[in-house]
């Protein structure tokens, strides 16, 4: 969902010399290196367009990509003869990977094979310093030593809070639905805004002890709305790798400067974190490990507000949309969860709630976050594809792995791979292993150098399933418009972007 980055190196030519050295191909399963030569007849070069150094086209291509990502990739794949590996230039000159085999290969590589672009966090976007100060945005997963050390110690901090997750979830969710019974939606009818109230409360009580547990109140919710808006362009800046396009992008983004009110809200949240009962212990824990703690509260704020609470609230848009468009499944799911206590223990695995579990994994499959990842080839490589074709990539080139497309590969998920099927995994639970959940190929091995931290500490599946299940138990709703669920339009998302409730009522009596 979020992208951060600095300007990429100029894309080198893909033409191989007559006597090319061996190119390494890495097995996605065993990571065994075997040499293949560029002279092999089945080794292909990606086709497509990388724009000239002084072109404005990366900006116009980026706009087309952002506006209708599904249409963009349909056109790209068609223009390249159906190839699942091809070149494109939406802000950065990249080689796209768009099928299951190439995505699995991408996720499986060690940092000496594929690494984040030097200094980059999410690819072509970077977070504005007004939000993170001098800190690195945590969990960004680039392999710079300072980040990797910080990530490991933050995971240790988060693990120390695992015993408090259940009480925080119970308090936040009970409060959220009591407010619904008492006040309806109030001022927050946009789906993202509505659920952000719940996710902000949960994350800040769980990680910082704010709210019910610690007795210290949360800052006003309007501060979180100001600091974590649905239009995230106010937090992020787009980077281009051609000077003309980069200048045009910066001029266009001048109107997106954070306001004085937004900056005051950021400071309000940062101060609440610094003042929490647990913060001094966090800082001491990290200082004892020689971690630079300058602006550390802003790094944590970026994690709990933007990457966690904001991401879960945005993820509720496809949840609401797919349940709205599948009323028969919604009724079946209600029969499964009604009257049941949804806890981290009870929802573990699929045994107790097979429909809820399958729905959760289908959401993961079609609406992954992040939907793509950018990394740099640290050596000449060969990329496998689901069709059996192999493509060569040169050292220094950027690869953009499109996870949502890889998880809609019909060779793995069948002829209905581009359709939402909430019961897809009920009778075929092994198929879940083909979903790259939160950036992991192997769901049982979460100690990798990238991938979601909440999953790494064993919490994210439970968090999401409880939030989904409680919504089904607690609420009846109507939307202001029919949701658009089409990968030909909104890849890894649903439309419209400002999806809103016409009405939400409690299913439970006052």
From Swiss-Prot:
InterPro entries: Cyt_P450, Cyt_P450_sf
Pfam families per the UniProt record, alphabetical: p450
Transit peptide residue numbers: 1-31
Main location: mitochondrion
Reactions the enzyme catalyzes: (13S)-hydroperoxy-(9Z,11E,15Z)-octadecatrienoate = plasmodiophorol A; (13S)-hydroperoxy-(9Z,11E,15Z)-octadecatrienoate = plasmodiophorol B; (13S)-hydroperoxy-(9Z,11E,15Z)-octadecatrienoate = ectocarpin A + H2O; (15S)-hydroperoxy-(5Z,8Z,11Z,13E,17Z)-eicosapentaenoate = ectocarpin B + H2O
GO molecular function annotations of the record: heme binding; iron ion binding; lyase activity; monooxygenase activity; oxidoreductase activity, acting on paired donors, with incorporation or reduction of molecular oxygen
Keyword DNA damage: no
Binding-site list for heme: 452
GO biological process, one term: oxylipin biosynthetic process
Compartments, record wording: Mitochondrion
Keywords: Fatty acid biosynthesis, Fatty acid metabolism, Iron, Lipid biosynthesis, Lipid metabolism, Lyase, Metal-binding, Mitochondrion, Oxylipin biosynthesis, Transit peptide
Name the UniProt record assigns to this protein: Hydroperoxide bicyclase CYP5164A3, mitochondrial
């Amino acid at each position: 969902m979020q992208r951060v980055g600095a300007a990429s190196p100029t894309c080198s030519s893909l033409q191989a010399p007559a006597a090319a050295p061996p190119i390494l191909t890495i097995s996605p399963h065993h990571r065994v290196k075997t040499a293949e030569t560029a002279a092999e007849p089945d080794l292909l070069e990606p086709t497509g367009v990388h724009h000239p150094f002084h072109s404005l086209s990366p900006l116009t291509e980026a706009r087309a990509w952002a506006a209708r990502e599904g249409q963009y990739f349909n056109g790209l794949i068609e223009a390249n003869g159906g190839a699942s590996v091809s070149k494109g230039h939406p802000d950065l000159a990249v080689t796209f990977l768009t099928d299951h085999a190439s995505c699995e290969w991408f996720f499986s590589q060690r940092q000496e094979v594929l690494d984040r672009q030097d200094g980059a966090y999410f690819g072509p976007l970077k977070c504005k310093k007004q939000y993170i100060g001098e800190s690195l945005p945590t969990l960004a997963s680039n392999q710079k030593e300072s980040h990797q050390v910080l990530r490991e110690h933050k995971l240790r901090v988060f693990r120390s809070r695992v015993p408090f997750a259940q009480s925080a979830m119970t308090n936040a969710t009970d409060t959220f639905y009591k407010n619904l019974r008492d006040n309806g939606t109030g001022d927050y009818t946009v789906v993202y805004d509505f659920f952000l109230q719940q996710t902000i409360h949960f994350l800040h009580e769980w990680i910082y002890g704010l709210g019910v547990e610690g007795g210290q109140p949360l800052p006003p919710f309007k501060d979180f709305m100001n600091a974590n808006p649905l239009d995230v362009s106010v937090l992020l800046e787009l980077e281009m790798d051609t000077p003309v396009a980069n200048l045009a992008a910066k001029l266009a983004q001048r109107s997106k400067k954070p306001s004085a009110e937004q900056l005051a809200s950021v400071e309000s949240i940062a101060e609440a974190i610094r003042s929490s009962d647990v913060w001094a212990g966090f800082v001491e824990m990290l200082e004892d490990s020689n971690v630079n703690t300058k602006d550390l509260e802003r790094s944590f704020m970026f994690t709990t507000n933007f990457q966690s609470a904001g991401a879960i609230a945005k993820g509720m848009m496809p949840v609401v949309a797919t349940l709205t468009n599948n009323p028969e499944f919604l009724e079946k799911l209600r029969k499964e969860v009604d009257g049941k206590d949804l806890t981290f223990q009870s929802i573990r695995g699929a045994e107790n709630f097979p429909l809820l579990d399958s729905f959760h994994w289908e959401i993961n499959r079609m609406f992954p976050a992040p939907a793509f990842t950018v990394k740099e080839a640290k050596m000449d490589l060969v990329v496998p594809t689901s069709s059996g074709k192999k493509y060569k990539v040169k050292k220094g080139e950027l690869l953009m792995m499109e996870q949502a497309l890889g998880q809609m590969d019909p060779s793995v998920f069948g002829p209905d791979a581009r359709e939402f099927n909430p019961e897809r995994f009920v009778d075929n639970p092994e198929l879940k292993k083909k979903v790259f959940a939160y950036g992991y190929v192997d769901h049982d091995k979460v100690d990798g150098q990238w991938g979601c931290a909440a999953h790494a500490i064993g919490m994210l599946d439970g968090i999401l399933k409880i939030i989904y299940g409680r919504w089904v138990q607690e609420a009846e709703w109507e939307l202001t418009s029919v949701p658009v669920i089409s990968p030909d339009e909104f890849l890894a998302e649903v439309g419209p972007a400002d999806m809103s409730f016409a009405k939400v009522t409690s299913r439970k009596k006052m």
